[in-house]
From Swiss-Prot:
This is Polyribonucleotide nucleotidyltransferase. One of its GO terms (biological process) is RNA processing. Its cofactor is Mg(2+). The gene is pnp. It catalyses: RNA(n+1) + phosphate = RNA(n) + a ribonucleoside 5'-diphosphate. Gene3D superfamilies: GHMP Kinase, N-terminal domain (3.30.230.70), K Homology domain, type 1 (3.30.1370.10), Nucleic acid-binding proteins (2.40.50.140). InterPro entries: ExoRNase_PH_dom1, ExoRNase_PH_dom2, ExoRNase_PH_dom2_sf, KH_dom, KH_dom_type_1, KH_dom_type_1_sf, NA-bd_OB-fold, PNPase. The keyword Transferase applies. It is an enzyme of class 2 (transferase). The keyword Magnesium applies. Signal peptide: none annotated.
């Protein structure tokens, strides 16, 4: 099967799509590639299940190690559960797709993207996003597309489209933008304190290219004779709709105008109104048109009641400029923070509160051996900074079974990690592995940005010398026709009933992370610009509150933190320090109660429970790698005896010979009369000859030299 191939020009990094060749039973399938990176994307649709009241969309992203010419490790030698990076790419595909499906659609939808080939010049994620749009269109699923995504990086002072991994790493910007014909649908960015104006310019630059990719998809569909499927929402019985609106409008409006600060009180009041309407419907005769409509659609009441609440909340914001808790549109909720909230056994801790959102962040410092090993398709082989986010059910007052972290928790942790990574000290200056855990103790919106703020304080409480503190705010949007209102520091109900969740994190100098998700089909860049600009004073206000509690990292690490010392050894001496079968390094570790990690470049990191042990272990390794010179004094161990003298191990793997005449001031008849195998004796190097042979003596050693040798012995 030959299939249909098309090339989409893209700034020198063309995209090739192959249709009608792979996965012929899938409703829509495409192989999309750039360079040697190729992603197979499929889309399928199944009939709606009974009782579903949401859009059942599942997006899966999978990586096959054969894509990079590798065989998986482990006993089974096959891929297991998706690595974290694959989960994040799955979310990256899902987030711009989801708002473009009709929200009333109840058919089961599944999009599967599989990276089948990978090179270092073309990351697969943005290809998968664009490929998902094409696959959905080919599957003839109702969709407000086309949609496409590009990545923007910085090379010098120039923005580039779809940069290589190396260009991303060097440039200080990793921005992914997805867009539809209506505007930008999704933004995901990590940056090295990029000024707001530059970030806005980069988003605008990306969307101009996205327009071309959208047009290319339209041209492709036209050539295939395929129309984009649009569909009208199912009709709602006006009798039931009017009944609910007439009874809900005034009570809901009154509740929203109470300006209640506590969401639980507000939610309880709204539930009471909905419950009263439900009771009134239940009391109607069975043949009443309202009762009949409610019986035919049991989920109509909660759906329509939500619609009334949404309409009135949005109306209040647009017409009166006031929010349900009484705040102005650009006002941040009350903030209070505290550091050192846990006992000193914990390395660093902080509690961050904003309104009813509360996050506790805890920092732990570890050795290089604690770094997370990565076994996926991406260039990084390990991570020294880990940020984990937990969202237990009690944070929203619910009772649910505890499960392993889901996609949302992994995504929020990755966002906080991305926000803080640019301000962390380089490992050459601070060799610790850093783990921060953000525990959401109470949630009323913007918990991910609460994690960023709490984690900044926690890191400083642990004595991590971050370059600058980072704060974050979540921005929202209400859009009705041409009326647009940007909301600062959104709470739960504004996120739930609003049109946008736009998280902005950064320092006082610029942005370190962005994440924008939409519930509408797109926004002009001008509106995004307004949101980014409105976020800055909010971030600085939050930062001021944080710094009032702790304005800089503590000068000392906590007593409970391990002590790390580093030293550089020549790479050709790594084997000497490790020893045969690891004997030497294991001996040092056991003797001084330390962990020793050695990089391929010869950087030795010693992790110890206290500074004394660390220094002793460092002295031992320095002794191992020290060049032996005439006049040096060592405490050595006798390893062999021959008639004319004895061999003495000075350092692991380094022996010298002491002649029988150099064993004592007096004449020695037999070597065994003076020393035995296993004896520890103090010796001085007489000479190192041209062949590297070491000649020793026990004569002429000052008592102070002997004592120093005993103190620094490594044999």
């Amino acid at each position: 099967m030959k299939g249909l191939e098309k090339i989409i020009p893209l700034d020198g990094r063309d995209i090739k799509v192959v249709l009608q060749k792979f996965a012929p039973q899938a409703a829509g399938s495409i192989l999309i590639s750039s360079g040697e990176t190729a992603v197979l994307v499929t889309a399928n649709r199944a009939a709606a299940r009974e009782g579903i009241d949401f859009l059942p969309l599942v997006v899966d992203y999978e990586e096959r190690l054969y894509a990079a010419g590798r065989i998986p490790g482990g006993f089974l030698r096959r891929e297991g559960r998706p690595p974290e990076k694959a989960i994040l790419i799955g979310r990256l595909i899902d987030r711009p797709l989801r708002p473009l499906f009709p929200q009333w659609l109840r058919d089961d939808l599944q999009v599967v993207a599989t990276t089948v080939s990978l090179d270092e010049n073309a990351p697969p994620d943005v290809l998968a996003v664009t490929g998902a749009s094409i696959a959905v269109l080919l599957a003839q699923i109702p969709f407000n597309g086309p949609m496409a995504a590009v990545r923007v990086g910085l090379v010098g002072d120039e923005f580039v489209i779809n940069p290589t991994y190396k260009e991303i790493e060097r440039g200080g910007l990793d921005l992914v933008v997805a867009g539809s014909p209506d505007g930008v649908v999704m933004v995901e960015a990590g940056a090295n304190e990029l000024p707001e104006a530059d970030m806005i310019e980069a988003i605008d630059f990306a969307y101009e290219v996205i327009r071309d990719l959208i047009q290319a998809q339209r041209d492709l569909l036209k050539e295939l004779g395929i129309d984009i499927v649009r569909a009208e929402p199912p009709a709602i019985d006006p009798t039931l709709e009017n009944f609910i609106y007439d009874r809900a409008a005034e009570p809901v409006k009154a509740i929203l105008k109470r300006f209640e600060k506590d969401k639980n009180v507000r939610d309880a009041a709204l539930d009471e109104v909905q419950g009263a309407i439900a009771q009134e419907i239940a009391a109607l005769p069975e043949d009443d048109p309202v009762a009949v409509a409610a019986a035919e659609n049991p989920k109509a009441l909660p759906t329509l009641f939500k619609a009334v609440t949404k309409k009135l909340m949005r109306q209040q914001i647009i017409e009166e400029g006031v929010r349900v808790d009484g705040r102005r549109l650009d006002e941040v909720r009350p903030i209070w923070c505290e550091v050192g909230v846990l006992p000193e056994r914990v390395h660093g801790s902080a509690l961050f509160n904003r309104g009813l959102t509360q996050v506790m962040s805890v920092t732990t410092l570890g050795s290089p051996a604690d770094a997370q090993a990565l076994d996926d398709l991406h260039p990084e082989d390990s991570k020294r900074y880990l940020h984990h986010y937990n969202f237990p059910p009690y944070s929203v007052g619910e009772v649910k079974p505890l499960r392993s972290p889901g996609r949302r928790e992994i995504g929020h942790g990755a966002l906080a990690e991305r926000a803080l990574e640019p301000v962390l000290p380089p490992k050459e200056e601070f060799p610790y592995v850093i783990r921060v855990v953000s525990e959401v103790l109470s949630s009323d919106g913007s918990t991910s940005m609460g994690s960023v703020c709490g984690s900044t304080l926690s890191l400083m409480d642990a004595g991590v010398p971050i370059r600058k503190p980072v704060s974050g705010a979540a921005m929202g949007l209400i859009k009705e026709g041409n009326e647009v209102r940007i909301l600062t520091d959104i709470q739960g109900i504004e996120d739930f009933l609003g049109d946008m969740d736009f998280k902005v994190a950064g320092t006082d100098s610029g942005i370190t992370a962005l994440q924008m998700d939409m519930k509408i089909t797109g926004l002009p860049v001008a509106v995004i610009q307004q949101a980014i600009e409105q976020a800055r004073p909010a971030r600085l206000h939050i930062l001021e509150k944080m710094l009032a509690v702790l304005d800089k990292p503590r000068p000392q690490l906590p007593p409970s933190a391990p002590r790390l010392l580093t030293l550089q050894i020549p790479p050709d001496m790594i084997g000497l320090v490790i020893g045969p079968g690891g004997k030497t390094v294991r001996g040092i570790s056991e003797q001084y109660n330390v962990k020793v990690d050695i990089s391929e470049e010869g950087l030795v990191t010693i992790t110890a429970p206290n500074e004394t042990n660390a220094k002793q272990a460092r002295a031992a390794i320095e002794g191992l790698t020290r060049k032996l010179n005439a006049g040096d004094v060592y405490l050595g161990r006798v390893t062999r005896i021959i008639p004319i003298g004895a061999f003495v191990e000075l350092l692991p793997g380094k022996e010298g010979m002491i002649h029988i005449s150099q064993l004592a001031e007096y004449r020695v008849g037999k070597v065994e009369d003076e020393v035995k195998i296993g004896d520890e004796i103090v010796v001085k190097i007489r000479e190192v000859d041209s062949k590297g042979r070491i000649n020793l003596t026990r004569l002429g050693i000052h008592p102070d030299e002997a004592e120093a040798a005993r103190s620094n012995s490594v044999v």
